[in-house]
Amino acid sequence: MKQWGLKPEEIDASVTARVPIYISNDSRYFQDKYQAIPIKGYTKLIENILNHKNITVQLNTDYKTLSQNEIKEFKAIFYTGAIDEYFDYQYGELPYRSLKFDIMTIDKEYYQKSVVTNYPNDYDFTIITEHKYFLDEKSNKTIISVEYPQAFSLGENERYYPINNEKNDKLYNKYLRESKRLENVYFFSRLGDYKYYNMDLAVERVFELLKKLENSIFTNK
């Protein structure tokens, strides 16, 4: 399978089950009763969150530059980076897949009939996304992004998809055990949990973690 660079039998069933097959006139990928995105898109949502008076953003700052004394000043640190990187790869690197995007402006109103089209056959790319569908924007031109799957190589590209199978999950569990020894550092996200989250599950994971911690760290006691 070109997205994963593996044979189907080498991929965990939970991953392959994420690709539904429908015989239907419904072109949507998901079948949830309620589906939505932020009214002005995710970029504006994140900008509004970061604009809060209690949030300070430090760019180009590696968490490793924080001293132990600085770390201890916080009731909780939520780490969304790669868990193997946090522990300096002491058990080895967790495998990932990466992506390369070609973003193009097309001189026509629409390029395709839906926001996302998957290409499982003999093309080098896997997905074409036409972004104007998300917010129902009107324009005589359109922008598409074409996704090309790649192997992840540390320092050369970005981690996108954890490759969940028995071998890799055993390696992740070694790092998970290390994380349990930390008093005030909590890991989540695709990289922190080494798990393939969609946006709804990523948000749900945050709420579950905060609910779990609300009586221990989010009180004035």
Which residues fall in each region the model found?
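Active-site/ligand-binding neighborhood in enzyme catalytic cores
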Residues: 1-76, 87
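Gly/Ser/Thr-rich helix-start
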Residues: 6, 82, 193
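Aromatic-acidic/polar surface patches that form glycan- and anion
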Residues: 35-42, 118, 195-202
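A broad, structural surface signal
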Residues: 44-47, 51, 88, 204, ...
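Hydrophobic, Leu/Ile/Phe/Ala-enriched alpha-helical segments that form helix-helix packing faces
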Residues: 49, 53, 135-138, 179, ...
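Mid-domain catalytic core of redox enzymes
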Residues: 61-178
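C-terminal catalytic lobe of FAD-dependent flavoproteins
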Residues: 158-221
